[in-house]
Regions:
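Nucleotide/phosphate-binding sheet-loop regions of phosphoryl- and nucleotidyl-transfer enzymes
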Residues: 1-214
Length: 214
C-alpha cells in the first residue's frame, strides 16, 4: 500500500488521494507509512476503474500487467507465491469508495485457492477443516459476486449439510463436510454458468477485479 504517497503528491491533497485510492486504500496506505503493521497489498485506482468502464469493460493497455507487477511485489514481501502449493499466497479483492459505505461493497476472499493449492495448504497447516472452509468461501463469494449466482443457492447447500450431519451451527461441521460443500458449490457454478470454477489463480484475480470494477 505504499502508493499513497505518490497519490497524494499527484493529486495535491489527502482528499485527492482518497478520491484516487478510495477511503479503504488510502487509509491502509496511511497506516503503512506510519509504521502500523499492515499486511502487504496494493490498490487499483478509481482512474483505472473509470478507464475500464469507459473502454467497454476492457482493461486499458498495461493496467492488468501493472496489477500483476504489484502482485509480484506482494510475493516478494511475503516470501510466498500466488498459485504455489508449497508456499501459497492468498489474496482478497475488495471494492472501495471515497466515503464509507457499510454493507454496499463487494469482497472476494481467499483468491488463489484451487484443488492443488488446497492440498498444499493442508500439508502446511495440518488443518483440512480450515482449508476447505476457506476454499468454499472463495467459491461461494466468487460465484455470487463475480458470476451472479444467487447466494441463497449456496446457503441452501450448507443448511442441507448441517441437517444431514445433525448439527445446528456451521462451526460444528467437519472437514469432510466442507470438502463436500466445496464440491457442490463448484457444481452449482457449472450449472448456472456452463463453465467450471476457474482453477487458475490469475484468472480468479482478473475476474474478481473486473467484477469489483462493475
Amino acid at each position: 500500500f505504499s502508493e499513497v504517497g505518490s497519490a497524494e503528491s499527484l493529486k495535491g491533497s489527502w482528499d485527492g488521494a482518497r478520491a484516487l485510492l478510495g477511503g479503504k486504500g488510502a487509509n491502509l496506505g496511511d497506516m503503512t507509512r506510519l509504521g502500523v503493521p499492515v499486511p502487504p497489498g496494493f490498490t487499483v485506482t478509481t482512474e483505472a476503474c473509470s478507464a475500464y468502464l469507459g473502454g467497454g469493460e476492457r482493461f486499458p493497455d498495461g493496467v492488468w500487467e501493472q496489477e500483476l507487477d504489484a502482485l509480484r511485489s506482494v510475493e516478494d514481501a511475503t516470501g510466498k507465491e500466488f498459485g504455489d502449493p508449497a508456499r501459497p499466497l492468498l489474496v482478497s479483492c475488495r471494492s472501495g469508495a471515497k466515503f464509507s459505505m457499510p454493507g454496499m461493497m463487494d469482497t472476494i476472499l481467499n483468491i488463489g485457492l484451487n484443488d492443488e493449492v488446497a492440498e498444499g495448504l493442508i500439508a502446511l497447516t495440518s488443518d483440512p477443516r480450515f482449508v476447505y472452509d476457506s476454499y468454499r468461501r472463495l467459491v461461494q463469494m466468487f460465484g455470487s459476486v463475480v458470476l451472479g449466482v444467487p447466494d441463497e443457492v449456496f446457503e441452501a447447500v450448507i443448511t442441507a449439510r448441517r441437517n444431514a450431519a445433525g448439527v445446528k451451527v456451521d462451526s460444528e461441521l467437519a472437514a469432510s463436510d466442507w470438502q463436500e460443500i466445496t464440491r457442490k458449490f463448484k457444481e452449482i457454478i457449472r450449472t448456472y454458468t456452463g463453465e467450471p470454477f476457474p482453477e487458475d489463480p490469475e484468472e480468479q484475480l482478473r475476474l474478481a477485479t473486473e467484477a469489483v470494477f462493475r
